Amino acid sequence: MTSRFTHRPAFRPASRSLAAALAASAMLAFTIPAARGAEALTVFAAGSTGGALATIAHDYTAATGQPVKLVTGPAGLLLERIEGGARADLFISANLAHPRRLTAEGKAGPTVVFARNRVCVSARPDVGLTSAKLLDKLLDPGVKIGTSTPKADPGGDYAWLLFEKAGTLRAGATAVLEAKARQLVGGRSAPEVPAGANPVKYFMQTHVVDVFVGYCSSHDTQPDPAFVQVELPPELAIQADYGMTVLEGRHDEAPWRFAMYLMSPAAQAVLPRYGFGAVGLADPGS
């Protein structure tokens, strides 16, 4: 199935009782407004959540007066910053492993699933990418593949998982794809792009790569007609669970209130607009 960045994946709904409980918890966040001049909450979050979280944080601040500072980037590098002593109140990663590591280290509370995503492949229309022929196209010697950086960014880890799965379908495919892939974003030494440019789109527009293995979600709510986004076929499909945890160190309830709000139907309803699966809605596609 091919679309022009309009595909929005379906996900299994959370239970209605859970949604009701989260709704009640979220109401508590609104009943106690932040004190005048309240210290901003610092949220370290995976770069792919930037658009959705900016909207959610804006709504929360407007309703409660609580300022929220978003710091987005490759989740693996954000994890390193936290472990190195960087101050953050919440951490949202594009995987569960990173926040669970902080939980196990005693640096954070329990880890919960905040949202779900899927891996998609984006391309210029002239590439002719389709879901049915996706693996053939990726293996084509003339097609240049871009990815994020494994270990530094879960997006790169998911790309390498895709390559591993490809190897179970075609002998030798894993080695071919790993050799072809260019790690262009998400690392410490990623190539520079013009100020304000979207790196993934820039590298495809300038033909540095022809396709890019990334997420089905987007930073924007409107599709970009300059590119197509293709869902992985069922035999290659990859789901990404996004983990969230509240970090130790702050001596008030503000981080926990915001965390509960993030899991509420009000906040979760924003996620599908950006292509994420919502775990806190009875109908995650609504």
Language-model features, listed with the residues they occupy:
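Bacterial N-terminal signal peptides
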Residues: 17-31
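N-terminal secretory signal peptides that target proteins for export/translocation
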Residues: 1-14
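Periplasmic N-terminal soluble interaction domains immediately after the signal peptide in Gram-negative
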Residues: 109-110
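Intrinsically disordered, low-complexity cationic segments
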Residues: 3-6, 35, 206
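Exported/periplasmic ABC-transporter solute-binding proteins
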Residues: 37-72, 76-86, 93-96, 100-104, ...
